[in-house]
Regions:
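Interhelical loop and adjacent transmembrane-helix boundary motif
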Residues: 192-241
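Membrane-interfacial helix termini and adjacent extracytoplasmic/periplasmic loops
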Residues: 1-16, 76-126, 207
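Periplasmic/extracellular loop-to-transmembrane helix junction in inner-membrane transport proteins
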Residues: 1-32, 52-53, 110, 219-230
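Transmembrane-helix boundary motif in ABC transporter permease subunits
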Residues: 32-63, 76, 252-260
């Protein structure tokens, strides 16, 4: 328990704590979902309800191909392209405007370096969009056409059909898809390592650097000397395995519940 609540990480003094990597992992994954879920929902709704038939398949394939891009490409793009642009043009504006808001302004404080917790979460959000959007699209397609056509026949708009027909019918699968994206974000290594800053510190400001479990393992496992140092890194890996396993197991159970419900309806 002391390992989980200790924020110190000092290999020289042989003092190790998992609080900072756990904090960085959970915060970046949360930011990724805040960014990725609305965009994924919009993409899935467009592909299933609004997109012309001749464009539906090409756009769907394009979204799925984005999931195949190696994570190191996202990380290098984030470090060499996005981070400098973000530090020069967006971060100062966010610090001046959002940082002045009482309460939540503390979240938008930090050095305008372009790398940090917020940037890592943003890159993760871009990475999980193809996964969540693909699952949501497949889930929306299992809604019986008769239900949607009946709603349209009563004069409902597209948004009303999605809100009152599609989402209630597929809410279990939607949550499962979101948790599947969360599992992807929790276990991401290379993209986060490039842009999170790799500093063992906890700060309220999202623009400050921090660290994640996967980044700690990638950066330090090869150079770990001493039994205690190696044991701390292995325990970090076990913590990440447990968190990811629970999230992915819950998502699979929710998707199985959706399929079981679909079978009962048919």
């Amino acid at each position: 328990l002391g390992f989980l609540t200790n924020a110190s990480w000092d290999p020289v003094a042989q003092e190790f704590g998992a609080l900072v990597p756990i904090f960085g992992t959970l915060i970046t994954a949360t930011i990724a979902l805040i960014i990725g879920v609305p965009v994924s929902f919009g993409i899935a709704m467009f592909l299933t309800e609004l997109c012309p038939l001749q464009l539906r398949r090409p756009l769907g394939v394009a979204i799925e191909l984005l999931a195949g891009i190696p994570s190191i490409i996202y990380g290098m793009w984030g470090l060499f392209v996005f981070a400098p642009w973000f530090a020069d043009h967006v971060q100062p504006w966010m610090m001046e405007t959002l940082g002045a808001i009482p309460g939540i302004g503390l979240l938008f404080q930090g050095l305008p370096m372009g790398i940090g917790v917020f940037t890592a979460g943003l890159i993760l959000g871009i990475m999980v969009i193809p996964f969540i959007a693909s699952v949501m699209r497949d889930v929306f397609e299992v809604v019986p056409p008769m239900l949607k056509e009946s709603a349209y026949g009563l004069g409902a708009t597209t948004w009303e059909v999605v809100r009152h027909v599609v989402l209630p019918y597929t809410k279990t699968g939607v949550v499962g898809g979101i948790m599947l994206g969360l599992g992807r974000a929790l276990g991401e290594t290379m993209a986060v390592t490039f842009v999170i800053g790799n500093a063992y510190q906890i700060s309220a400001g999202l623009f400050n650097p921090s660290n994640s479990i996967a980044s700690s393992l990638a950066n330090e496992f090869a150079e770990a000397e001493g039994e205690l140092y190696l044991s701390a890194l292995i325990e970090l890996g076990l913590i990440l395995f447990f968190i990811t396993f629970v999230v992915l197991a819950c998502s699979k159970l929710l998707l199985l519940r959706l399929k079981a419900g679909e079978g009962k309806e048919s």
